[in-house]
Amino acid sequence: MEAVEIVATITPDQELLAAAALHDTVEDTDVTEEQIRAEFGDRIASLVAAESEELPVGISETESWRSRKQAAINRLAAASHDAKIVAMGDKLSNMRAIARDYEEIGDELWTRFHAPNGKSDHEWHYRGLAASLAELSNTSAYKEFVYLLEKTFCK
């Protein structure tokens, strides 16, 4: 629900808040985009779909990590303003968790992920996300995101 709280600092739009609440549903459960569309409508389903990443069949998460993240950065760069707001909630929530865990356990953190080059891959990914979300640079959420990015990766 942290993503919803973050999005609420940017907009009161109830559909964006709903999309933020549902942003990982397609990726992490058996619920489909079509089911979300039937229950919540086109706009929310489209916003959730914009945040969903598909794993390629027959390739490990580690082998496909960089290409998946590059595709996500590219999609986000081309996404609508509303989709970027929903993504900001998700990405800042993730960055908060990374920064918090990095403070606690240091470089051991990077072994939890599928990025083949650990911390350097994550830095590349999060800097790409920051560039893709730059139109939100006037928001406190974006400013916190960049602050945490610098704090975490410039150590």
Language-model-detected regions and their locations in the chain:
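Active-site helical microenvironments for divalent-metal-assisted chemistry
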Residues: 1-155
